[in-house]
Design a protein with these regions (language model features):
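Interfacial juxtamembrane loops and adjacent helix segments
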Residues: 72-150
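Transmembrane-helix motifs of polytopic, lipid-linked glycan transferases
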Residues: 155-178
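Membrane-interface helix-loop-helix junctions at transmembrane boundaries of multi-pass membrane enzymes
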Residues: 176-179, 268-275, 357-379, 530-534
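Short acidic/glycine- and proline-prone juxtamembrane loop motifs at membrane-interface regions
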Residues: 200-208
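Perimembrane helix-loop-helix junctions
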Residues: 221-226, 231-232, 252-283
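Short hydrophobic alpha-helices at membrane interfaces in multi-pass membrane enzymes
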Residues: 224-243, 247
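Transmembrane helical bundles and short interhelical boundary loops of multi-pass, membrane-embedded
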Residues: 265-266, 287, 298-307, 438-535
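Membrane-lumen/periplasm interface segments of multi-pass, membrane-embedded glycan/lipid transferases
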Residues: 288-365, 484-512
């Protein structure tokens, strides 16, 4: 591909919502649509926030215990007790393991049993952080503690969702138009549906996913920006690094993986010294944080031991399990909750179709920089679980769940989708080449179908989560099943004194998702339409 001229470079780095020349979409209309898009995203996110009860995400009994009693527990005012001869902390009864996870793993039971616990009484729990996680997330989450455990957890979930929308929205707004579209497409596709579930939860994985992607996308965008935009993007990258380093040890390590990937993606020059310094410092801090936490060690302590097998047999077991492991990013075999919400069928198939469509589209504009940066991230995604399995002498990809590597999936998509940098007359990087969406009748129909599948998959994923906890597990046909019921008719669980019922939440959340993807698809194609009109 040849270099673009200065006029195209200027267009590529134009301000958000800038009108196209001649008959382009007016800036005012573009801004109004962008605002409506943000509102739709917020509404859809809040529907995910309230879709499941307290304790519903993996190991949430541990996370709520750590939220109430962050380390060091001896200095934070928590009441210390014992349970089964071990040191325990006192938490509201509704957060004790036997109550908050009373429905976990039991597909047939709703979350009704969780309503029997009291916020007034205290109970001991052995589930609290004693060095497995970095300092930061639990200390911040403790600020949300209040008398009502439901309100505390919902407030934290809502904050995490709004934090992701605010930080990533700022990056998208500050990035040049070509890269802005690539960033939004990457996270929209890679986070369907599991990413949305974790981002809107109280699990530290929320910060891990937001921080990891913010660090990667903001750093990449800042290398193609100038002035205040560049400064703002560097600040966003720093914020992402802080989130990654204060949430999980593995997400802190991901900063190093991203730094290596960006070294391939971004041409070296004196101009990127600030970004290079930030990425190197963040990588060093991330490795240090990971070395001081015990998350990786805790994974190695459990699993299907195959120590009696040969080394090559263990390699085979790990590598052969990778296809199912990777499909876990879209909920296959590893759905929400304590893996007790099944996404096999419609949801995992629909999300897989969207991912495959975007991967196929990205192949039309590959470059050696894209390939090497994507291989770097893909190597970490597949290599880390396999190496852990080999070191632990068991097929660890069945234990080291896909959600641990999910933060890197959106980064992988971004490395493939990001357009090449544009250059001005002096050869200096200035913005990005346009992000091209499929054109022509077939291209537009295909784009519309992919967007429709995305909206349908998101709606179905939200429905299944609500149904699981409101009614218990319901058998659905395979591989495609769109059967629904009135979620407010006979439901056994819902938030006490909630102003709206589960059916209203699902309908509003699903419609908001439809509106959001429709507006996003229209705005993504804006630059291409304008350029076609100019010729």
């Amino acid at each position: 591909m040849g270099e673009v001229g200065p006029q195209e470079a200027q267009s590529a780095s134009s301000t958000p919502g800038a009108p196209g020349r001649g008959r382009g979409t007016p800036a005012r209309s573009r801004y109004l649509l962008a605002v409506l898009l943000v509102v739709a995203v917020i509404v859809a996110s809040l529907a995910w926030v309230v879709s499941s009860p307290v304790g519903s995400s993996p190991d949430e009994d541990f996370h709520v215990g750590s939220m109430w009693c962050p380390p060091p527990v001896d200095e934070t005012g928590c009441q210390i007790s014992t349970k089964d001869g071990e040191k325990a902390v006192m938490v509201p009864q509704s957060l004790a393991k036997e109550y908050v996870t009373c429905y976990a793993f039991d597909h047939d039971n709703s979350a009704q049993c969780a309503l029997n616990a009291s916020d007034e009484e205290l109970a001991p729990t052995l589930r609290w952080d004693d060095g497995n996680y970095p300092w930061g997330y639990y200390q911040f989450a403790h600020l949300f503690v209040q008398h009502s455990t439901n309100r505390a957890v919902l407030a934290l979930r809502a904050f995490n969702a709004l934090l992701a929308i605010g930080l990533l929205g700022a990056i998208i707004a500050l990035a040049d138009s070509g890269l802005r579209r690539a960033i939004s497409v990457a996270l929209t596709v890679a986070w369907l549906p599991m990413g949305f579930y974790f981002i809107t939860g109280m699990n530290p994985s929320s910060w891990a996913m937001t921080g990891t992607f913010a660090f990667a996308s903001a750093l990449l965008a800042s290398t193609r920006s100038e002035g205040r935009r560049r400064a703002g993007l560097i600040a966003c990258a720093l914020a992402g690094a802080v989130l990654a380093c204060t949430s999980r040890g593995d997400s802190a390590f991901f900063l190093f993986v991203i730094t290596v990937a960006l070294a391939f993606a971004v041409p070296l020059s004196r101009r990127i010294v600030p970004e290079a310094c930030l990425s190197c410092v963040a990588s060093a801090v991330g490795i240090w944080v990971m070395s001081r936490t015990n998350v990786a060690a805790s994974h190695l302590a459990s699993g299907s031991d195959v120590s009696g097998e040969s080394w090559w047999r263990i390699v085979y077991l790990n590598v052969s399990a990778l296809p199912n492991y990777l499909r876990g990013f879209v909920g296959y075999l590893f759905g929400p909750g304590w893996n007790d919400v099944s996404y096999q069928g419609t949801v995992s198939s629909g999300a897989s179709l969207v991912v495959v469509a975007l991967l196929a589209w990205s192949l039309r504009s590959l470059s050696w920089r894209k390939v090497l940066s994507a291989i770097t991230v893909a190597g970490a995604i597949t290599g880390v679980p396999v190496v852990i399995g080999l070191r632990g002498h068991f097929n660890n990809v069945l234990v080291y769940q896909p959600r641990y590597m999910l933060p890197l999936f959106a980064v992988f998509m971004l490395m493939l989708l990001a357009p090449s940098p544009a250059r001005d007359e002096g050869g200096r990087s200035l913005g990005s080449r346009p992000f091209r969406v499929p054109q022509g009748v077939a291209g537009r129909v295909g784009t519309g179908l992919v967007a429709a599948v995305w909206a349908l998959t998101n709606a179905r994923a939200l429905y299944l989560v609500i149904e699981r906890y409101a009614f218990g597990h319901t058998a659905h046909g395979m591989p495609i099943d769109l059967s629904t019921r009135n979620l407010s008719d006979g439901n056994e669980w819902w938030w006490p004194n909630a102003p709206v019922g589960p059916m209203t939440v699902w309908v509003v959340g699903a419609l908001a998702g439809f509106v959001a993807i429709a507006l996003a698809a229209y705005l993504w194609g804006g630059v291409t339409r304008e350029r076609l009109q100019d010729h």
